[in-house]
Structures are given as C-alpha cells and as structure tokens.
A protein has these predicted regions:
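Hot-dog-fold acyl-thioester-processing enzymes
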Residues: 1-86, 148-161
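HotDog/MaoC-like acyl-thioester-processing domains
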Residues: 1-14, 91, 96-99, 104-161
C-alpha cells in the first residue's frame, strides 16, 4: 500500500495521481445525514429540491460533496502532520444523485517549515478540482504540513493564508 509522499518527495507543478472516481447514491446522502445530523433542507427533501431548482433527481448534500472531494485527495497527504487550512472553496453547481465525481490535485507551492524534535517538515499548497464528467463542480486550495524523509529541501515558495 502507498502511504503517500514525504514533503521532500514533492515538486511544484506536480500532478498527484488521482484516486478512483465515485458514483453518488441516495444511500450516500442518507448515511451522511445520519452520521452528521446535517439538515440541509434541499438535500433532505427531494420534492422541494425539484420544485425549487427544476432538477430531476435528488440533491446531494454540498457537505458530502466536499467530504468526498477531500477524501479523493488524501493520497497527497496521507503522511500529514496537520491539515492547516482550506481556502477559496467554491461549489459551482448542485450535484445530483447518480453523478460520478473525480478529483485532481496539483502541487501549487512548497515551503520548508521549522524542524520540530529534529524532524524536518514543510507546508504543501495544493490546488484541488472535482469534476462530474468534464464539468467542474468544486474547486479549492488546501495547505498541509508534511514530514520530510530526509533533509529539508530548501523550498521557499510564498504560500497564501
């Protein structure tokens, strides 16, 4: 099993190999609601969603869309010491049951961080896009703190936030 890269194994502009796509079901929506208690009105009431939006199916909870998208990027950060923040989060349109999501991740920047207990580490800035077919449905940025396998590589990109 691949446990993800160390900080010093990444390079700016690198595209991280994607994880498998996921087709969303009504059961996914129901399970997400049961686990989180999220009462998003239009995701909970498909009749109301269809009347309000003109959609033809059931709305997938936007929170679930983000959770799936984040989960599809964990191959870049499996070794993360910390997920520092997300920024510029956009969900661009409603997603309905039956759509298949795939997520791509690119390294936007790298910056060495201060060592802690003799462990070299660094911040990785990721650009993330989630699509249904060819259509982008979500995009955002994520910054995580990763350990180095060896010496600090000397990255000094400006990372926002």
């Amino acid at each position: 099993m691949d446990y993800g890269p160390f900080f010093d194994q990444l390079s700016k502009g690198e595209v991280i190999a994607p994880l498998p796509s996921l087709t969303l079901s009504a059961a996914d929506n129901t399970f997400y609601r049961a686990v989180t208690g999220d009462q998003h009105l239009l995701a909970a009431n498909s009749d109301l969603y269809r009347r309000v939006s003109g959609g033809s199916k059931e709305l997938v909870n936007p929170g679930l869309i983000m959770q799936i998208s984040i989960g599809q990027t964990t191959n870049a950060t499996r070794k993360a010491i910390a997920n520092l923040y997300y920024r510029s989060v956009e969900i661009l349109r409603p997603v309905e049951v039956g759509e298949t999501l795939s997520t791509s991740t690119v390294v936007l920047g790298l910056r060495d961080a201060s060592p802690k207990a003799d462990l070299n580490r660094g911040k990785v800035w990721l650009g993330i896009e989630t699509r249904s077919g060819e259509e982008m449905i979500a995009r955002y940025e994520r910054v995580a703190l990763l350990p180095c396998a060896g010496d600090a590589p000397g990255h000094s990109d400006e990372i926002p936030g």
